[in-house]
């Protein structure tokens, strides 16, 4: 190792080392490998051009700690037999401090989703379904995820910039909503320690020469930082009760370069780039409103102009000349960016308009056609395949690329973010055009733009709007999966892989429920037109379900519903955005009751079985959980004020063997709280997911009868807790926001492992859960 000259080529040594180290990895992934293996095996394999599943075995991945497998895969390019490595790269940014069992389980699910999409159970031998140490058995999936996640942030990133240090290192800089600045290697690994301002959000970052950069935030302060040393050098400006609305460099034709700072009251301040002291230089008078700034490069001897946006108006100013105003935008301008062509710049606004302008005349030279849907939040200028281009970030979660000369789109939309991108920057140091975006989904994503206009758009899975599994009580011959997205609704048979489409029309399905009426299995679908449709399942011949009627009374779409038996009747409880809980007799297809006690929308519905009959439990956006008696209406019990900054979801834990019946609520604050159904008091400490709101929640029992809860939300992680022991059992990381959890509970006594469905922006997956090892 110390004398690389002894080898014919440097990669020969790494290839042999990787081969030798791979032989030291135990076949059982539950056995911890030597720390050197987990830290360096993937790197040796990459350097030796043998980065594949044989040289980096599956068993070492749950222990992998180099945190750069996804980067190594990008550098090494496509290889042979990298299925497990690629599956690990998808979830690697999200696993963080998960325990090895959770990592292995997450890897197992990710691998199945990537390699067995829509594969029927009959097509997968039982021997290949299991994996030693995994807590699940994947059964069926329709899951598509982008692989361009560069990094994941705990906090919302609101600003991005890039810089090249004096030693040639290319770095990304991000500023977040909590006032923290982080630096990243261009492959996503953090560089240095976070820098804390202990002030407002960092919304502007401006790299300078000599390894410095400037930040501006909502606390009204401008700060100067040393990039390599990671320390604060100066705070030349602080204006309380204002915020920094713009930062740019400005070089007049006959004066030294300076830093221009704009505050929310329209005041401009010029700072010397060496001393950071205020300098006396001519500046335009602005309205008392937030100003967005960018310096516009002119011809070599003409210095720079300044483009300034305030509200819907943009103007161009040069020292010694009058302000040149452009035509007024339709809506508030969100970003102004300088183009590499002298005297040219681009703007975008909340109407979705993107304009390209000439600074000398104030006239528009081109406009983006067609305009993207919704507001455009940020812009970045760069060369794409030799053409001057602008990348836009839209409220519709996409990035788009535009020719800066014609305004015409280059290629299709770039999809992958699950929330709007908030900031953009070009990524330096690569021969290809690259852009990094920071989204409200708390991910930094890397986009390769070379050849974008000539290659077909990547197929992106539409987010699932509803999904469900039938319970054991539904007379179905095999595992059925109901899935809906914007493209339509389908009923899949996981055993055969076949599916049928529901002729549900153009309205999107917002919720599912399963029921049995007079022995006939039914599927109920709630729609965006506020109606509920009833379908009879033709399980015998695999044909499309037939329509059995429609329930209409809600004024806003139903968000949750649950069917249950009450004596000889089959009832349906529904909760809607109109704030009401309604009760229906499915046999007669008529409404029995309407309860309007929730002040805001009803987000979830559950049913609690008690000795005295079933109770309907509803979770409201007003932060309460309420109980309803199907026979009498309100159960006579007061609402539960959950104190969770809003309740998104609710589940029930029926009593067994002398246990108390419990109600679980999932909140905006990221907690799950348990409530005694009899006393309506808190039952023990809350469970803390620790990674964002809990928006989906189910309860189930293991074959041994242990009550468990599974919770998920926008973080994309499924948390599993033991209710009795109050312990966290498992984290199943998917890397994409989840909106739905459903459970197929087994009959009494529990003789099988429960089956869990998870669905969200990337699709749907179904798996058996095995927790008895704990």
Language model segments and positions:
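Hydrophobic core register within WD40 beta-propeller blades
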Residues: 160, 205, 247, 293-296, ...
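Short coil/turn segments within WD40 beta-propeller repeats
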Residues: 178-181, 219-221, 265-266, 312-314, ...
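Residue-level detector of Asp-centered blade-edge/turn motifs that repeat once per structural unit
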Residues: 163-168, 207-210, 250-256, 298-302, ...
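Short loop/turn segments that connect beta-strands within beta-propeller blades
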Residues: 186-189, 227-230, 273-276, 318-321, ...
């Amino acid at each position: 190792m110390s004398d690389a000259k002894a080898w014919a080529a440097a990669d020969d040594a790494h290839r042999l080392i990787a081969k030798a180290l791979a032989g030291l990895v135990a076949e059982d992934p539950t056995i911890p490998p030597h720390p050197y293996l987990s830290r360096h095996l993937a790197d040796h394999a990459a350097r030796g051009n043998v980065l594949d599943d044989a040289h980096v075995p599956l068993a070492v991945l749950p222990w992998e700690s180099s945190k750069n497998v996804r980067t190594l895969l990008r550098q090494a390019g496509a290889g042979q037999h990298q299925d497990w490595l690629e599956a690990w790269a998808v979830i690697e940014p999200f696993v963080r401090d998960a325990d090895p069992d959770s990592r292995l389980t997450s890897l197992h699910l990710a691998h199945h989703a990537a390699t067995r999409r829509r594969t029927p159970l009959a097509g997968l031998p039982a021997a290949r379904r299991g994996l030693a140490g995994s807590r699940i058995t994947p059964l069926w999936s329709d899951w598509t995820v982008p692989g361009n996640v560069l990094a994941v942030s705990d906090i919302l990133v609101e600003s991005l910039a890039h810089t090249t240090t004096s030693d040639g290192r290319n770095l990304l800089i991000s500023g977040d909503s909590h006032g923290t600045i982080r630096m990243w290697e261009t492959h996503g690994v953090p560089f240095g320690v976070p820098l804390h301002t202990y002030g407002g959000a960092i919304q502007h970052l401006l790299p300078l020469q000599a390894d410095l950069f400037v930040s501006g935030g909502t606390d009204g302060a401008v700060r100067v930082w040393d990039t390599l040393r990671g320390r604060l050098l100066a705070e030349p400006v602080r204006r309380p009760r204002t915020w920094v609305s713009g930062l740019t460099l400005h070089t007049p034709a006959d004066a030294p370069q300076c830093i221009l700072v704009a505050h929310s009251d329209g005041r401009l301040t010029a700072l010397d780039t060496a001393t950071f002291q205020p300098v006396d230089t001519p500046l335009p008078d602005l309205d008392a409103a937030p100003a967005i700034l960018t310096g516009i490069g002119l011809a070599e001897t003409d210095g720079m102009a300044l483009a300034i946006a305030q509200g819907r108006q943009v103007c161009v100013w040069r020292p010694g000349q009058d302000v040149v105003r452009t035509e007024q935008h339709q809506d508030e301008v969100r970003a102004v960016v300088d183009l590499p062509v002298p005297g040219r710049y681009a703007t975008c606004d909340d109407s979705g308009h993107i304009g390209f302008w000439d600074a000398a005349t104030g006239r528009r030279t081109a406009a983006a056609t067609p305009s993207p849907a919704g507001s455009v939040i940020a812009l970045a200028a760069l060369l794409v395949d030799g053409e001057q281009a602008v990348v836009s970030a839209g409220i519709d979660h996409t990035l788009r690329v535009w020719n800066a000369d014609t305004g015409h789109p280059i290629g299709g939309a770039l999809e992958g973010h699950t929330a709007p991108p908030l900031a953009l920057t070009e990524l330096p140091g690569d021969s290809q055009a690259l852009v990094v975006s920071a989204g409200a989904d708390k991910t930094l994503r890397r986009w390769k733009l070379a050849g974008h206009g000539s290659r077909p758009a990547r197929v992106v899975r539409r987010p699932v709007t509803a999904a469900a599994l039938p319970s054991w009580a539904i007379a179905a011959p095999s595992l059925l999966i109901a899935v809906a997205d914007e493209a339509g609704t389908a009923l899949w048979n996981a055993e055969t892989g076949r599916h049928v489409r529901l002729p549900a029309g153009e309205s999107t399905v917002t919720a599912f429920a399963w029921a049995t009426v007079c022995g006939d299995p039914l599927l109920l679908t709630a729609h965006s037109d506020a109606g509920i449709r009833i379908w009879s399942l033709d399980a015998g011949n695999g044909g499309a379900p037939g329509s059995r009627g429609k329930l209409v009374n809600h004024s806003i779409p139903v968000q949750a519903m649950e069917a249950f038996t009450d004596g000889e009747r089959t009832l349906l409880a529904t909760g809607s955005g109109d704030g009401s809980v309604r009760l229906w007799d499915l046999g007669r297809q008529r409404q029995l009751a309407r309860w309007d006690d929730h002040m805001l929308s009803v987000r979830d519905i559950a049913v609690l079985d008690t000795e005295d009959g079933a109770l309907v439990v509803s979770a409201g956006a007003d932060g309460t959980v309420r109980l309803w008696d199907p026979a009498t209406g309100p159960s006579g019990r007061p609402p539960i004020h959950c104190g969770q900054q809003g309740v998104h979801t609710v589940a029930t834990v029926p009593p067994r063997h002398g246990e108390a019946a419990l109600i679980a609520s999932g909140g905006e604050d990221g907690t799950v709280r348990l409530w005694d159904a009899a006393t309506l008091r808190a039952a023990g400490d809350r469970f803390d997911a620790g990674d964002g709101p809990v928006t989906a929640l189910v309860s189930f029992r293991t074959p041994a009868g242990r009550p468990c809860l599974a919770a998920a939300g926008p973080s994309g992680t499924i948390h599993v807790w033991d209710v009795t022991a109050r312990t966290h059992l498992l984290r199943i990381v998917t890397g994409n926001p989840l909106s739905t959890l459903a459970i197929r509970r087994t009959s009494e006594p529990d003789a099988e492992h429960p089956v869990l469905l998870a669905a969200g922006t990337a699709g749907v997956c179904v798996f058996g859960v095995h927790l008895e090892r704990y």
